[in-house]
Amino acid sequence: MFLSEAGARPRAGEASASERRKWVKVFKACDEDNKGYLSREDFKVAIVMLFGYKPSKIEADAVMSSVNPNTSGVSLEGFLSAVKRKKEARLYRNEIRQIFTAFDVHYRGFLTLEDFKRAFSRVAPKLPARTVLEVFREADQDSDGHVSFRDFEYAMNHGQSK
């Protein structure tokens, strides 16, 4: 039993028609020479336009590594796929934030074992106290008795990959 099994799954699904139109419009705006693809710099500008931040080198490298060797950039379909994945990751992170906030009833910015016990007693009342303690200890990365949002997010994502 791990935190991610409590139901925090990304909502996979197709982008709405209006979102897709917006993404295509941004792609076309950044593809100034109508090459049919976005260069690394074009891609970065497009991400700034859509998400409000410049992607890291690692993020840009990940997208550029999937580029067709016959072109010098990301095709429209590759761009749409990357943007969809990024949107889903953002939704999932927001969902994790909401779960953390629901656990943090005292608005301290961290969770204690008591917070875990209270939350799990509501969502899984038959769960043994030993299991709740194990989950808390696994989430408490530095064993300081507090689970920060970063600890919580890591635990949720770690549980997703199991």
From Swiss-Prot:
<feature type="domain" description="EF-hand 1">
    <location>
        <begin position="18"/>
        <end position="53"/>
    </location>
</feature>
<dbReference type="InterPro" id="IPR011992">
    <property type="entry name" value="EF-hand-dom_pair"/>
</dbReference>
<feature type="binding site">
    <location>
        <position position="151"/>
    </location>
    <ligand>
        <name>Ca(2+)</name>
    </ligand>
</feature>
<dbReference type="Pfam" id="PF13499">
    <property type="entry name" value="EF-hand_7"/>
</dbReference>
<feature type="binding site">
    <location>
        <position position="142"/>
    </location>
    <ligand>
        <name>Ca(2+)</name>
    </ligand>
</feature>
<keyword id="KW-0479">Metal-binding</keyword>
<feature type="binding site">
    <location>
        <position position="140"/>
    </location>
    <ligand>
        <name>Ca(2+)</name>
    </ligand>
</feature>
<dbReference type="InterPro" id="IPR002048">
    <property type="entry name" value="EF_hand_dom"/>
</dbReference>
<dbReference type="InterPro" id="IPR018247">
    <property type="entry name" value="EF_Hand_1_Ca_BS"/>
</dbReference>
<feature type="domain" description="EF-hand 2">
    <location>
        <begin position="91"/>
        <end position="126"/>
    </location>
</feature>
<feature type="binding site">
    <location>
        <position position="146"/>
    </location>
    <ligand>
        <name>Ca(2+)</name>
    </ligand>
</feature>
<protein>
    <recommendedName>
        <fullName>EF-hand calcium-binding domain-containing protein 11</fullName>
    </recommendedName>
</protein>
<feature type="binding site">
    <location>
        <position position="144"/>
    </location>
    <ligand>
        <name>Ca(2+)</name>
    </ligand>
</feature>
<dbReference type="InterPro" id="IPR050145">
    <property type="entry name" value="Centrin_CML-like"/>
</dbReference>
<dbReference type="Pfam" id="PF13833">
    <property type="entry name" value="EF-hand_8"/>
</dbReference>
<keyword id="KW-0677">Repeat</keyword>
<feature type="domain" description="EF-hand 3">
    <location>
        <begin position="127"/>
        <end position="162"/>
    </location>
</feature>
<keyword id="KW-0106">Calcium</keyword>
<dbReference type="GO" id="GO:0005509">
    <property type="term" value="F:calcium ion binding"/>
</dbReference>
